[in-house]
């Protein structure tokens, strides 16, 4: 289905108030979600849970997130009120955090992590859908870069503040503070004008202007979309290689640095977030100037070099510099994941379902990663583990180089090339 210029021009109608409010939603949502993850493991360990029990509940939460991807995408394509879905998901996360803080019993913690996991197929894709609905396809790259900047800033700020809260107050207080972030998040969300979120655009059907659900291609057609399958496979391989890299590095740092390992691992996580804050808007601009494929190759190549350097040095000071490359990868993928899916599903009405498909395959890759590369490292040594990750990363670069098509619309590319200055 052709996309008319008038359809995309409507993106300019979104008010500055709505776009600024979306900045706040990205910031506070990332901050709210940062209360989970490593802080859950720390709290449960402090509550004298066994390592097996902690691993079990975290795995169940991750599995729930994996199962939620496709239904979440289907829901986002079908329901007009994306703000309602974001609010519902955020409330689920906040209720889960509150339950963990007040009653960290096994049934409640398990239920809280399942609740939080179920939002995984909803919140991130919903932010992308709202962004597309507000600004249209032609301005989406820049908007996604801005989203990534504010999300990284929110996660970084929350991690620092919650670390201080945990140190001076208690680990339970971290989750009380996390749940309190629901209030500013809902306040920011309420400032996004629902009338400015174009329903058709938010589903990848920009010519549909009615308040009813837009026409959609059959679901099975997504499995025949060559570019989408190559991209989803690339993200599967990326997550398969990437998810094990920091845990494997953390194990080696623990052997070498003892009690200082947690601080070193925290630094390895923080450094890329700082890079993303500064680099994400640039990635959005370059996605329009260079095209999607060169930027994707840059991000994956940075990952391959990073994995190789991890195999060559265990010096924590050098690893901090190596982690700058993770910021490059994070900033490019933070923009390109939703952008490439939007390119490939333009005019289909299945943008969000396609996001769910890509998210499912990426999640499967991440879930297999740690077990596989830990097995390699356990049998052949840590260096072999890092080298095998680097080899997988090189295969990833080759796949994108040989088979991934450029997805930026030809008309948009021509417009960029003829623009003055």
Where are these regions (language model features)?
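A membrane-interface helix-boundary motif in multi-pass transporters
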Residues: 167-180, 375-392
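C-terminal membrane-cytosol helix-exit motif in multi-pass small-molecule transporters
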Residues: 179-203, 396-404
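Structural signature of the two symmetry-related core transmembrane helices
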Residues: 84-98, 179, 294-309
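Cytoplasmic helix-loop-helix junction between adjacent transmembrane helices
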Residues: 114-151, 340
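Helix-loop boundary and gating motifs at the non-cytosolic
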Residues: 12-62, 230, 239-253
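Juxtamembrane intracellular "pre-TM" segments in multi-pass secondary transporters
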Residues: 2-16, 196-231, 420-421
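A late C-terminal transmembrane helix in Major Facilitator Superfamily
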Residues: 350-379
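Helix-to-loop junctions at the C-terminal end of transmembrane segments
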Residues: 68-81, 279-291
């Amino acid at each position: 289905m052709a996309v008319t210029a008038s359809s995309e021009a409507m993106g300019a109608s979104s008010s500055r108030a709505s776009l600024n409010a979306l900045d706040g939603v990205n910031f506070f949502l990332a901050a709210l979600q940062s209360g989970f993850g490593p802080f859950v493991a720390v709290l449960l360990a402090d509550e004298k849970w066994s390592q097996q029990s902690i691993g079990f509940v975290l795995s169940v939460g991750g599995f729930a997130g994996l199962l939620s991807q496709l239904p979440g995408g289907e829901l986002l394509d079908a329901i007009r009120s994306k703000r309602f879905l974001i609010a519902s998901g955020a409330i689920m996360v906040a209720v889960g955090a509150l339950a963990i803080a007040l009653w960290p019993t096994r049934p409640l913690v398990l239920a809280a992590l399942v609740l939080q996991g179920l939002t995984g197929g909803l919140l991130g894709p919903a932010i992308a859908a709202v962004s597309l609905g507000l600004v249209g396809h032609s301005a989406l790259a820049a908007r996604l870069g801005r989203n990534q900047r504010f999300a990284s800033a929110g996660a970084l700020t929350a991690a620092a503040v919650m670390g201080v809260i945990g140190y001076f107050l208690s680990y339970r207080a971290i989750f009380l503070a996390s749940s309190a972030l629901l209030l500013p998040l809902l306040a920011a969300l309420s400032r996004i004008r629902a009338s400015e979120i174009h329903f058709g655009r938010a589903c990848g059907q920009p010519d549909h202007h009615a308040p009813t659900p837009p026409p959609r291609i059959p679901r099975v057609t997504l499995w025949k979309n060559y570019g989408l399958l190559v991209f989803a496979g690339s993200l599967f391989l990326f997550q398969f290689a990437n998810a094990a890299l920091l845990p494997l590095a953390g194990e080696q740092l623990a052997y070498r640095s003892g009690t200082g390992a947690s601080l070193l691992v925290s630094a390895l996580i923080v450094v890329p977030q700082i890079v993303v804050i500064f680099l994400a808007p640039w990635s959005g601009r370059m996605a329009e100037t260079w095209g999607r494929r060169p930027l994707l190759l840059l991000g994956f190549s940075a990952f391959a070099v990073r994995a190789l350097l991890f195999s060559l040095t265990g010096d924590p000071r050098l690893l901090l510099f190596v982690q700058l490359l993770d910021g490059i990868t994070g900033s490019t993928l933070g923009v390109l994941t939703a952008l490439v899916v939007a390119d490939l599903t333009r005019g289909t009405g299945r943008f969000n379902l396609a996001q769910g498909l890509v998210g499912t395959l990426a999640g499967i890759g991440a879930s297999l990663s740690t077990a596989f590369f830990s097995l390699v490292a356990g049998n052949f040594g840590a260096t072999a583990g890092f080298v095998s990750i680097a080899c997988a990363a090189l295969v990833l670069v080759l796949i994108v180089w040989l088979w991934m098509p450029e997805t930026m619309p030809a008309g948009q590319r021509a417009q960029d090339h003829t623009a003055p200055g």
